[in-house]
């Protein structure tokens, strides 16, 4: 069984909410911070409480490495400890690293994020340099069932600068990327009909949602853009297949939910936000 199979089963069991642990120190409630601890140690305490509170309603977690790299060595220890906490909770974890290099460098990235202190179940990758920026990760998919989510059509406003440019044959650049990755993924199929090579498909540009889902039925989607970035449940639902086939990420909306729920502890508020998000997406899927 591949990690993508396990993610599919996690979504079946708990829903498609992906909790983004893009944890900035400034997000921590002031009365939670222990002055005798480092920023990294406080972030780990915060993350662990969030994981404990939300693991029953989270399909997976996504840990954005930049928030930890910015704190230097203590931040990287916090990153490793956070990945470990998610894995110990028995929930799939995505390392949001967006690597895009080739050859030996990419081999080292793959080793660094699929084994050892920073081991994760999935990584995010950037395909701009070509398929040889993806291939060094594939032995881990083949031998260990590891997975990856490759940037295809993203949720940021600047996506239109490159991804939406049209080719001579009428396709967009994101179509070319998706087509090549979908074809490559045919050799890495899991038991539930999804490849170990997933796609990052932003939930804020919905014009082609139905077409994209129908076109890449073998590809599991990582769908950013929900909540703070403007993505709505009724839009997100169009990228899912009977409520599965993708995970929907929310970071600030969950991490900072306590600011919209006065008097509620941050971990309880995060749980409430996950439940609300899960129910909203399920309702939207039921209307399709």
Residue ranges and their predicted role:
Residues 13, 58, 115-121, 142-148, ...:
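Glycine-enriched alpha-helix->loop->beta-strand junction motifs that scaffold or abut catalytic
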Residues 70-85, 102-107, 129-142, 204-213, ...:
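Active-site-adjacent beta->alpha loops and helix N-cap segments on the catalytic face
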Residues 1-63, 68-81, 85-92, 262, ...:
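Conserved N-terminal beta1-alpha1 strand-loop-helix module at the mouth
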Residues 97, 101-198:
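Conserved anion-binding
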